[in-house]
Amino acid sequence: MTDVTETEVVTESAEPREPVIIDRPIQTVGRRKEAVVRVRLVPGTGQFNLDGRTLENYFPNKVHQQLIKAPLVTVDRVDQFDIYAHLDGGGPSGQAGALRLAIARALILVQPEDRPALKKAGFLTRDPRAIERKKYGLKKARKAPQYSKR
Protein backbone atom coordinates (compact mmCIF):
# COMPACT_ATOMS: atom_id res chain seq x y z
CA MET A 1 0.00 0.00 0.00
CA THR A 2 1.11 3.54 -0.63
CA ASP A 3 1.10 6.17 2.07
CA VAL A 4 -0.61 9.41 1.14
CA THR A 5 0.53 12.50 2.99
CA GLU A 6 -1.64 15.56 3.24
CA THR A 7 -0.21 18.85 2.04
CA GLU A 8 -1.53 22.26 2.89
CA VAL A 9 -2.59 24.44 0.02
CA VAL A 10 -1.31 27.96 0.54
CA THR A 11 -3.73 30.57 -0.76
CA GLU A 12 -3.07 34.26 -1.06
CA SER A 13 -4.96 36.60 1.24
CA ALA A 14 -8.19 38.08 -0.12
CA GLU A 15 -7.45 41.53 1.28
CA PRO A 16 -6.16 44.12 -1.23
CA ARG A 17 -2.41 44.58 -1.44
CA GLU A 18 -0.67 47.55 0.14
CA PRO A 19 -0.56 50.61 -2.15
CA VAL A 20 2.61 51.27 -4.10
CA ILE A 21 4.08 54.76 -4.03
CA ILE A 22 5.34 56.03 -7.37
CA ASP A 23 6.82 59.51 -7.77
CA ARG A 24 5.94 60.02 -11.45
CA PRO A 25 3.46 58.63 -14.00
CA ILE A 26 4.47 55.34 -15.61
CA GLN A 27 4.27 55.43 -19.42
CA THR A 28 4.18 52.34 -21.65
CA VAL A 29 3.14 51.29 -25.14
CA GLY A 30 1.13 48.25 -26.25
CA ARG A 31 0.49 47.01 -29.79
CA ARG A 32 -1.81 44.43 -31.36
CA LYS A 33 -2.75 44.01 -35.04
CA GLU A 34 -2.84 47.62 -36.32
CA ALA A 35 -3.64 49.17 -32.91
CA VAL A 36 -1.14 51.20 -30.89
CA VAL A 37 -1.98 52.28 -27.32
CA ARG A 38 0.03 54.68 -25.15
CA VAL A 39 -0.77 54.39 -21.42
CA ARG A 40 -0.04 56.60 -18.41
CA LEU A 41 -0.47 54.90 -15.03
CA VAL A 42 -0.89 57.21 -12.01
CA PRO A 43 -1.90 56.46 -8.40
CA GLY A 44 -5.66 56.82 -8.07
CA THR A 45 -8.97 55.03 -7.61
CA GLY A 46 -9.28 52.74 -10.63
CA GLN A 47 -10.59 55.27 -13.16
CA PHE A 48 -10.04 54.70 -16.90
CA ASN A 49 -9.69 57.67 -19.25
CA LEU A 50 -9.50 56.40 -22.84
CA ASP A 51 -9.21 59.37 -25.21
CA GLY A 52 -11.39 61.36 -22.78
CA ARG A 53 -14.03 58.62 -22.38
CA THR A 54 -14.70 56.01 -19.69
CA LEU A 55 -13.92 52.31 -20.16
CA GLU A 56 -17.63 51.41 -20.35
CA ASN A 57 -18.23 54.16 -22.91
CA TYR A 58 -15.23 53.34 -25.13
CA PHE A 59 -15.59 49.54 -24.89
CA PRO A 60 -19.31 48.70 -24.43
CA ASN A 61 -18.51 44.99 -24.94
CA LYS A 62 -18.12 43.32 -21.50
CA VAL A 63 -15.62 40.80 -22.93
CA HIS A 64 -13.28 43.64 -23.92
CA GLN A 65 -13.72 45.28 -20.49
CA GLN A 66 -12.77 42.02 -18.73
CA LEU A 67 -9.81 41.53 -21.07
CA ILE A 68 -8.50 45.02 -20.27
CA LYS A 69 -8.93 44.71 -16.48
CA ALA A 70 -7.39 41.21 -16.33
CA PRO A 71 -3.77 42.30 -15.54
CA LEU A 72 -4.99 44.56 -12.71
CA VAL A 73 -7.17 41.76 -11.28
CA THR A 74 -4.29 39.26 -11.50
CA VAL A 75 -2.01 41.41 -9.31
CA ASP A 76 -4.82 42.74 -7.04
CA ARG A 77 -4.44 46.40 -7.97
CA VAL A 78 -7.83 47.21 -9.54
CA ASP A 79 -8.56 50.30 -7.41
CA GLN A 80 -5.01 51.60 -6.93
CA PHE A 81 -4.26 53.28 -10.27
CA ASP A 82 -5.92 55.64 -12.70
CA ILE A 83 -5.22 54.79 -16.33
CA TYR A 84 -5.01 57.42 -19.03
CA ALA A 85 -4.69 55.98 -22.54
CA HIS A 86 -4.39 57.27 -26.09
CA LEU A 87 -5.63 54.65 -28.58
CA ASP A 88 -4.69 54.70 -32.28
CA GLY A 89 -5.58 52.48 -35.23
CA GLY A 90 -7.17 49.05 -35.46
CA GLY A 91 -10.59 47.99 -34.25
CA PRO A 92 -12.08 47.28 -30.82
CA SER A 93 -10.44 43.86 -30.34
CA GLY A 94 -7.01 45.05 -31.42
CA GLN A 95 -7.23 48.14 -29.22
CA ALA A 96 -8.40 46.09 -26.22
CA GLY A 97 -5.47 43.66 -26.65
CA ALA A 98 -2.99 46.51 -27.05
CA LEU A 99 -4.37 48.24 -23.94
CA ARG A 100 -4.05 45.03 -21.91
CA LEU A 101 -0.39 44.64 -22.95
CA ALA A 102 0.39 48.28 -22.12
CA ILE A 103 -1.24 48.00 -18.67
CA ALA A 104 0.67 44.78 -17.91
CA ARG A 105 3.97 46.40 -18.93
CA ALA A 106 3.22 49.42 -16.73
CA LEU A 107 2.42 47.20 -13.72
CA ILE A 108 5.85 45.57 -14.04
CA LEU A 109 7.57 48.95 -13.96
CA VAL A 110 5.60 49.78 -10.79
CA GLN A 111 6.23 46.44 -9.03
CA PRO A 112 8.81 44.09 -10.64
CA GLU A 113 7.76 41.25 -8.26
CA ASP A 114 4.47 40.98 -10.20
CA ARG A 115 6.28 39.88 -13.38
CA PRO A 116 6.04 36.07 -12.86
CA ALA A 117 2.27 36.19 -12.25
CA LEU A 118 1.67 38.39 -15.30
CA LYS A 119 4.02 36.30 -17.45
CA LYS A 120 2.31 33.05 -16.40
CA ALA A 121 -1.09 34.51 -17.30
CA GLY A 122 0.29 35.47 -20.73
CA PHE A 123 -0.23 39.22 -20.38
CA LEU A 124 3.34 40.14 -21.37
CA THR A 125 3.33 38.35 -24.71
CA ARG A 126 2.90 40.59 -27.76
CA ASP A 127 0.42 38.76 -30.01
CA PRO A 128 2.28 38.57 -33.36
CA ARG A 129 -0.76 37.64 -35.45
CA ALA A 130 -1.65 40.18 -38.12
CA ILE A 131 -3.71 40.20 -41.32
CA GLU A 132 -2.08 38.20 -44.11
CA ARG A 133 -1.68 40.19 -47.31
CA LYS A 134 -3.71 39.49 -50.45
CA LYS A 135 -1.74 37.78 -53.25
CA TYR A 136 -2.20 38.46 -56.96
CA GLY A 137 -3.97 35.66 -58.83
CA LEU A 138 -6.06 34.92 -55.73
CA LYS A 139 -9.35 36.44 -54.59
CA LYS A 140 -8.21 36.91 -50.97
CA ALA A 141 -5.06 36.02 -49.03
CA ARG A 142 -5.56 32.27 -49.61
CA LYS A 143 -8.87 31.88 -51.45
CA ALA A 144 -8.29 30.81 -55.05
CA PRO A 145 -10.73 31.29 -57.92
CA GLN A 146 -12.88 28.28 -58.76
CA TYR A 147 -10.96 25.58 -60.63
CA SER A 148 -12.45 24.23 -63.84
CA LYS A 149 -10.98 21.01 -65.19
CA ARG A 150 -12.42 21.50 -68.71
Swiss-Prot record:
Any single GO BP term: translation
Question: Which classification does the entry list for the species?
Answer: Bacteria, Bacillati, Actinomycetota, Actinomycetes, Mycobacteriales
Family stated for the protein in its record: Belongs to the universal ribosomal protein uS9 family.
- The gene behind this protein is rpsI
Record keywords, A-Z = Ribonucleoprotein, Ribosomal protein
Name of the protein in question: Small ribosomal subunit protein uS9
Tell me which PROSITE patterns the record gives: RIBOSOMAL_S9
Instruction: Look up the record and report any one GO term of the cellular component aspect.
Output: small ribosomal subunit
Q: Which GO terms describe its molecular function?
A: RNA binding; structural constituent of ribosome
Q: Which InterPro entries is this protein grouped with? A: Ribosomal_Su5_D2-typ_SF, Ribosomal_uS9, Ribosomal_uS9_bac/plastid, Ribosomal_uS9_CS, Ribsml_uS5_D2-typ_fold_subgr
